[in-house]
Amino acid sequence: MDYKHFKGVHANIVIEVISLLEKGVKKAQEILEKPDAGSYTKLENSSGDTPIKADLALDKFLEENFLSLENVKSVFSEEKEKPVTKENGSYLIAYDPLDGSSVMEANFLVGTIIGIYEKDYKAHNLAASLYVVFGHKIELVVALDQVYRYAFYQNKFHFIETIALENKGKIVASGGNQKDFSMGLKKALEGFFTENYRLRYSGSMVADVHHVLIKKGGVFSYPQKKLRKLFEVFPLALIIEKAKGEAFYFDKGVKKRLLDQGVESYHEKSECYLTSQHEAQILEKYLKGE
């Protein structure tokens, strides 16, 4: 892989993580392709979810590889109660080994989300983030100073494009239980569909956000506090912001930046809106004051 796009103080750790992923893609793919990969285990993770076999196998594989990096002090999986910590290193990695596992048996797109933090697991210390999506193609998206997209081909990640969202999109990925949506959110969504936006929600957050990114705009929304800050929300929020979009939530009817949120506990959850600029304005108009 050509690393010419990665510059700045955090470039080296990003390159090291990508290098590990590039070498490990085939192993990860083998794990996902096993006939029983989507079978549920009899275990329960720290968030109260029942992981599938591929979740645990990918988690073990990634943890071992991330801990092998000299400059990584701590590694924290969504599947674990607390981080695994070493004596040395400057960076902390939080990751969701298999986002979208609940729809894997339907052969939908799934992926691995990774946040690279510095000093501690706080949003303001998020140095970079990336994800890998597994489908008929394997792709990598990385946020450092900008957002870069790669495709895996012949054992290497090849650069496709620098992603920048346009002001307005045409995709809506609205997750959660619609009966619990506020009246403002229902009106905002109705307005998008009146403007011929297309519904593209799969149940895999990484897949739906990837769709918004490659279509250069739109809305991903999850108004219930179900998504984990450290492993899903913060890393994808950084990617959206670096792609010139907005990442926000509403606190008593006031729109606030996701990456300004604090973290009171490791597995704390949040609502989440990831959008291009126009859609952010529309959502604020309808949800303000609710």
From Swiss-Prot:
A single Gene Ontology CC term: cytosol
Key words of the record: Carbohydrate metabolism, Cytoplasm, Hydrolase, Magnesium, Metal-binding
UniProt: Mg(2+) 2 binding residues: D96, D99, E232
Entry's localization field: Cytoplasm
Known catalytic reactions: beta-D-fructose 1,6-bisphosphate + H2O = beta-D-fructose 6-phosphate + phosphate
Positions that bind substrate: D99, G100, S101, S102, Y201, K226
GO biological process: fructose 1,6-bisphosphate metabolic process; fructose 6-phosphate metabolic process; fructose metabolic process; gluconeogenesis; sucrose biosynthetic process
The keyword Transmembrane belongs to this UniProt entry's keyword annotation: no
Record carries keyword Membrane: no
Cross-referenced HAMAP family: FBPase_class1
Protein name per its UniProtKB record: Fructose-1,6-bisphosphatase class 1
The species this protein was found in: Helicobacter acinonychis (strain Sheeba)
Protein's gene: fbp
